[in-house]
């Protein structure tokens, strides 16, 4: 039986393969990282097979979100705010469509809230 870390890596590789197959590299991807305390998201444009360029980024450590609370911010409320902030920053750079890269995380809870917040101004 595989442990949770192995299952996470398998899910992550499966999601990345689907993104590469479906988008064909023509859309930037919205990548998500979650820790126990914070959540981070960035819009990445893949230039080649080994090169990538970050277009916009947002996290719970940003000044707009950080001033509201001093405690843990990896919850649904803050994840939605991070998604909205990232969508605003991507729109200011001219990005309207992205592919959602949830990594190895299940599409549930915080990850879903971030996607819903970003979906208000971006097309998936």
Curated annotation (Swiss-Prot):
PANTHER family: 39S RIBOSOMAL PROTEIN L18, MITOCHONDRIAL, LARGE RIBOSOMAL SUBUNIT PROTEIN UL18M. This is Large ribosomal subunit protein uL18. Belongs to the universal ribosomal protein uL18 family. InterPro entries: Ribosomal_uL18_bac-type (IPR004389), Ribosomal_uL18_bac/euk (IPR005484). Signal peptide: none annotated. Keywords: Ribonucleoprotein, Ribosomal protein, RNA-binding, rRNA-binding. This is one of the proteins that bind and probably mediate the attachment of the 5S RNA into the large ribosomal subunit, where it forms part of the central protuberance. It comes from Orientia tsutsugamushi (strain Boryong) (Rickettsia tsutsugamushi). Part of the 50S ribosomal subunit; part of the 5S rRNA/L5/L18/L25 subcomplex. Contacts the 5S and 23S rRNAs. Gene3D superfamilies: 3.30.420.100. CDD domains: Ribosomal_L18_L5e. GO terms for cellular component: cytosolic large ribosomal subunit. The keyword Transcription regulation does not apply. Pfam families: Ribosomal_L18p. The keyword Acetylation does not apply. GO terms for biological process: translation. One of its GO terms (molecular function) is 5S rRNA binding.
């Amino acid at each position: 039986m595989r442990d949770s870390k192995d299952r996470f890596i398998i899910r992550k590789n499966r999601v990345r393969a689907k993104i590469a197959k479906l988008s064909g590299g023509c859309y930037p991807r919205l990548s998500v990282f979650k820790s126990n305390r914070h959540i981070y998201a960035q819009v990445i444009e893949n230039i080649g097979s080994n090169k990538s360029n970050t277009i916009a980024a947002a996290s719970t450590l940003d000044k707009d979100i950080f001033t509201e609370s001093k405690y843990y911010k990896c919850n649904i409320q803050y994840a939605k705010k991070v998604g909205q902030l990232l969508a605003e920053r991507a729109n200011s750079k001219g990005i309207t469509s992205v592919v959602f890269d949830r990594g190895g995380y299940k599409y549930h809870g915080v990850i879903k809230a971030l996607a819903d917040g970003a979906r208000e101004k971006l097309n998936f």
